[in-house]
Amino acid sequence: MNFKGVKLLKNSKKRLDFLPNTLNKYSIRKFTVGTASILVGATLFLGVSNEAEAAEKIDSPTKEKVATTEEAATKEEAATTEEPATKEEAATTEEPATKEEAAIAEEPATKEEAATTEEPATKEEAAIAEEPATKEEAATTEEPATKEEAATTEEPATKEEAAIAEEPATKEEAATTEEPATKEEAAIAEEPATKEEAVTSEEAATKEKAAIAEEPATKEEAAIAEEPETKEEAATTEEPATKEEAAIAEEAATKEKAVTSEEAATKEKAAIAEEAATKEKAAIAEEPETKEEAATTEEPETKEEAAIAEEPATKEKAVTSEEAHGINNKNKQLLDMDKNSTIDEKFDYAKQAINELNINQKDISNIEASIKNNSDLKNLSKEELNNEILRAALVNESNNNDYGLQTLSAIEPLTTNVRNKNNSLSPVSRLKMLATATSGQNVNDKINITNASLTLNQKNNQHDDNTVWPTSNEQLRLSADYELDNSIKEGDTFTIKYGDYIRPGALELPAKNTQLRSKEGSIVANGVYDENTTTTTYTFTNYVDQYQNITGSFNLLATPKRETVTTDKQTYPMNVTIANQEVSENFVVDYGNHEDHLTNAAVVNVDNVNNQHNEVVYLNQSGDRIYDAKYFSIVQNGTFIPNEVKVYEVLDDNVLVDSFNPDLNGPAVKDVTSEFTPQYSLNNTRVDIDLNRSNMNKGSRYIITQAVKPSGTGNVNTTYELTRYGNEASRYPTGTKSTTVSYINGSSTAQGDNPTYNLGDYVWLDKNKDGIQNDDEKGISGVYVILKDSNNKELQRATTDDTGRYQFNNLQNGTYNVEFVIPNNYTPSPSNTIDNDTIDSDGQKDGDSNVVVAKGTINNADNMTVDTGFYETPKYSLGDYVWKDTNKDGVQDSDEKGIQGVTVTLKDKNGNVLKTTTTDENGSYRFDNLDSGDYIVHFEKPEGLTQTTTNSDSDENKDADGEEVHVTITDHDDFSIDNGYFDEDSDADADSDADADSDADADADADSDADADADADSDADSDADADADSDADADADADADSDSDADADADADADSDADADADSDADADADADSDADADADSDADSDADADADSDADADADADADSDADADSDADADADADADSDADADADADSDADADSDSDADADADADSDADADADADSDADADADSDADADADSDADADADSDADSDADADADSDADADADADADSDADADADSDADADADADADSDADSDADSDADSDADADADSDADADADADADSDADADSDADADSDADADADADADSDADADSDADADSDADADSDADADADADSDADADADADSDADADADSDSDADADADADSDADADADADSDADADSDADADSDADADADADSDADADSDADADADADSDADADADSDADADADADSDADADSDADADADADADSDADADADADSDADADADADADADSDADADADSDADADADSDADSDADADADSDADADADADSDADADSDADADSDADADSDADADADADSDADADSDADADSDADADADADSDADADSDADADADSDADADADSDADADSDADADADADADSDADADSDADSDADADADSDSDADADADADSDADADADADSDADADSDADADADSDSDADADADADSDADADSDADADADADSDADADADSDADADADSDADADADSDADSDADADADSDADADADADSDADADSDADADADADSDADADSDADADADADSDADADSDADADSDADADSDADADSDADADSDADADADADSDADADSDADADADADSDADADADSDADADADSDADADADSDADADADSDADADADSDADKYHNDTADKSNDNELPDTGNNTQNNGTLFGSLFAALGGLFLVGSRRKNKNNEEK
């Protein structure tokens, strides 16, 4: 790869977030031997957090503990002598610090830092000066500390914070007299102890603890002595500093006082002046670094700030005035600025901040120049400017600008600086750790990619620019230029990600490890390729820490990815993303695979790791018959690798992909190598394979794979031949091919299997400068190490870790150069001083470069001896004295005093200013941290004084040296540079002294008091503005959250829930049906059929009783369902609506108006419907006839059923309710419903039939009126259809029908539309809403919409979805829950109130909902309902509520019914469900319990209601509600249970099947739909009944149990009601009785009738089916079968197919329907179909439904099926159950029905079919479809393959690289020879024959 020089781009705005790092595994950025001032600067500007502690323990030669004479240091806690502090708070001497803030006692030490007052620090800790007492307080020694606690003078610190008395030390920390150091730094006083430890007479420091003079720091924070300041502000002794600035004490002692020869630093430790650093911690006296900020003693700061003492002690010891003179540093306050300050203001701020770093003038100039040249200075904020100052300081510190390479032309050179600090190792290590993050970050966004392109690397003139021939050695070239942001650091990463059709590399496999280099060869980043993600991740080396503004470019090879690019002459998009820049080009790829050639071959890849070429050969790709075949291959410049040649027989031609990358691990090939053992030549340059015994003579194809190992430097050429005979001289060639591998840029250099080793060792601090590692000499971290080969090419880079170690890996034998970059302020140790490579220093200085170089040799072993040592370059001081020479003799006399305030400037030998200072009160000055060299000291003459005589005495220490003195320092300090001045003589001036009075003006100086303005700092208080934060109270807006009350709107859902209840109601009714679903009961019918009696719920619907009810409850039921009471209860449920309606009721009442209509209808319809169902049956017949109507009904019913199916959907809704639950119900209902439907049909059956029959019988008679009503319904239904639209009004009627839901009743069957109506009711409610919709839809849809409803149901489904919503509203449920509680009651009510619940809910929700309702529509609905508004609301509801209903919320309530879930348990009841759900169910349970009571109440109520209103039914409904809930729940769970039901469902399914089938069949019937309606009837009758019965049985099982139990349970209370419930509920027992009669009749009749109806329906169906048939069309049926859905099961897949087929067939039906699809349209078609009419529609709907069902409704119906689906859902489960198909079989029967429907219809065999088909169709079809599809596909694929291959052609064939054309002559010669041979043989045979003759 070519890499150009790089340019490093630094983002000056990026904050350098320095984090501590103590892990050896991370490379540490080296900031050279940084000074403590830089460390302080980092704190001042950045506020480094002290997150981590030093990783290693501090070694100290001292004993573990040294007791002091008067004070003992404690281990971790400080005990107080007077008062304990509270937990986690530190007590201050005057004011307490806040929680978790450190109270600083004026001079505290923090944990893990040791400080002594007059005591030495340990080996690795800094000692505190002798006299640490602050200005405010004097150190005392009078209060001893306890064993584990140190006493404080006034208040103790608590467990977590050690507030230490005057002089306690905490564990492992060094404290300064002025301020605490942070967690990882030791505080250094200005006069630390001498060598290793000096134990004073008063105090001794322990190994890891140093006692602090007066006040300790706490564990993590320092206790504040007098007055804590606010967070993040630093206070000075007199004036507070601004945020993030450290206040400096007024009088800081000098950094390093004059050190006498007796006071030299010891061998082991260099005592450091202002900033003594220990190995791991440095406590800084003057400019301490605290966790965030530094503060002074008088006004110490609170959390994260440290207090600074005013007068810190000196470094090594207290120096007397004769020994050294201190420095008077004026207390300066840093200027402040913000982002809007001017450039000059910002620069002034920066200058002052830089001066505070206390570094030499040259460094200051460099940093100031960097800041001044920052083009973005104008836009920098204070924090950003602080970061930039620190960045510039660190860059200036780095001084690593040369690694033995020339400075890149694209890189800004970095200047070398002379440090003016005595830099120790520890601050460097700490600063390095602080400045380096623990791990790199992805910096894709910090790399600017330009000029990125993807082109052909090597173009063949035989094709255009966007075509690539990979097998002809063509590659793609990826090129780009890049620019790196300066904030990128070592360890950061960026990526190059390759797309799906491209990979890196050429013919070679991608290298695992790659490198990005500069143009000089330095490694900029190391890359690792991941073939799983096709991504190369590059990690930057320390190269980016060394240079700025790095720019460069690269060129990488890439090639098409053969695994995905498999077809010749196809265009593929080649995408590569470099960092964040994407490059994309389209290329046509051609591998040159000639399918008509007998031999095709290619080199697939070159594996450099294993040093081999992998080749693939296709033999006889065209499939010719080849006899006596032999294969051989010859290689030049290489050898075949034995055992790597493999032979595969091709079993599937698709494996022969054009890319020569076949899948050899799959079933498409067979490894037959063992049958044809390859034979190798002696030198392995030829391999032969005898294929004579292969199947090639039968046209088989073979694949040969072989591996070649290159043996030379030339191109590797391989030929491949397939011959008839192996003899080359006389061979009859049938195919030849050759390949050639040539190399580009030497990219194929093999690595082979050579072993690799490691090289490395250690860089250490050679304290004794002898070049030999001693045991006590530690490693130096952060040193850059560069590995180069013998040709000086850079190979790897590393940085020494915290222990000084480095290592390079994966190296082969050879000699290497190891370069160590010399750290600043260090000098290389002598090299090779002894003959022991393991401990001596190996590095030798390399000329003028800043590196030492060591040789390292690897010879079959690791070499871990290449090490080098450095010692600290010594620093020196210069200074002396400026005095007033009163006698003017130029010599210092003892009575002559110093002059304060004289400016002294230090310059280098060229006159450049390095430092400036002023003399202190004694006239002393001093410059520290100077290297050996030449300097100039300049004294600025004070105004009014005259220079004295210079060099007047031989004593250099006493005479004056003059105003400018040249000084040379050579390995020593110079404290002899002084000067003197005397007062100017001017008596005249003396007179002017009178003017001295004018000095009174000097008082003007008092104006200097203007400094009082410093008080302006009190403006800091303006921070009080922080109170503005009180605006945070704006959060009060959070109150807006109160809007969350809007969620109360969710209550709307609650209303929805109310509606949900409505659904419940519907379901309630539906459930009533549900109870009908109890139909599950109907199944119960089956069970009870007694449940039939429970269908007495059916009875409920046994509206027969319902007529009974109808009579009493008729309305009760009707009402019960309908409204009257049903609504009353219905309202109860209605109340479900009642609630929704409850308000709804009001509305409900309004609805009751609507419902009233409903009632009117209900009664009418109730009976009507009940009759309707009865009629349904009668209508069924009517429907059959009416099927037109039925279809109309079919629509209505159809939908109803459709809904029924729809209902199934409705069940779906019921399921809707059910679905969420409904489906659940669907299962529960659906099953139940299914039964519901089935039952719905069942109802139809159970009710319809049973009831219908029952009704038919019971009501039939009574319903006979009902029938008349039935007619009414049938008309109603008819109307429903007719009205469907009219029922659109029927809405009200629909409601009516909803009430027709009476259908509810009838359609109680209808699932009282338990379905539709469940939806209907759901819609009732839903319709109420649904009606709203269903009204709306109900309208048209009511019927036609019935399909619409079906859609309504779909809406119902919507409700189903609603249910989904309902569940969603389950949130509503939340309200529901609120209601839940209320539901609890509600449920209690649920039953009674179900609606009551609804109300509760409504109310609860109502209230919540009330908002909701209020919002709601609920009320609105109510109103809406109140009026046609109901419809309006319907809309409203339909909107809100519909969904609200949709919300199924009902379900949601039902779900709310989470209780439902409880119901679920109820569901268990659900199974009981059925009745259980029935209801005790849920609510019984949910409310269960309350409901249980509720249910009991429900029953009770329901009974109460039940009794009172058939509400029993209503309650039943309420139970229904319970069911609804229960079902909803039960549904939900019902499903579960439903599944139980599903079991029931399975019965349900049976029903489901009934449904499913009923639907399916129903669908078939559903197709009958009419039957669906009829179906209701149909189902009810035909299959339904049969199924119903079957189901019934199924139900019988589930329900009977379920109900029995359910009721048993709920009714257990209910059971009285149980069945009585069912009945009780249903009948309110009263009915129950009537029902029981009804039951008796119901079943009796129901079955009888059912049968008769079945026939009737069958006829109905037959009619319906007639239509149905055509539509059912047998297809339908077949689909039915498909639906039969054994497919249903198949359905499940079959459905999938069967659905598809179902659809498809359904489409057949569908087709019949296509409408099925139409059904989606079918629904609309349903209408259309309703035109179909009922028939077609019935079917179509039915089919539509069934299809619809199959499809959408299929889903819907499927719901029916859904129920099936429901079952499908449950169904699927149910179906599964359905498939539990036992029912499925029933279904099969159902299918039979389905078919029978289709046929049944066709045959009107509803009956005949019902059963007979049952079997026949069911399965056979199912299977038939399944198989046919299977084959179909197989073939279709086959065709597809043929089509694909047939079109292949090569317009431009690739040249066979390396092909040998001279063989052509041989070919022709051989051909003619062969022909001649044939003639010769023939001639001889002829002659022989002649001879024999």
From Swiss-Prot:
Kindly state a single biological-process term from the GO annotations of this entry: cell adhesion
| Organism of derivation | Staphylococcus saprophyticus
Q: Provide GO CC annotations from the record.
A: extracellular region
Keyword tags? Cell wall, Peptidoglycan-anchor, Repeat, Secreted, Signal
Please give the name of this protein. Serine-aspartate repeat-containing protein I
Give positions of region: 21 X 12 AA tandem repeat of [AP]-[AE]-T-K-E-[EK]-A-[AV]-[IT]-[AST]-E-E.
72-323
Q: Where is this region: Ligand binding A region?
A: 324-755
Q: Where is the composition biased (Basic and acidic residues)?
A: 54-222, 240-284, 312-325, 955-975, 1837-1851
**Lineage of producing organism:** Bacteria, Bacillati, Bacillota, Bacilli, Bacillales
Q: Name the propeptide positions.
A: 1858-1893
Q: Where in the cell is it found?
A: Secreted, Cell wall
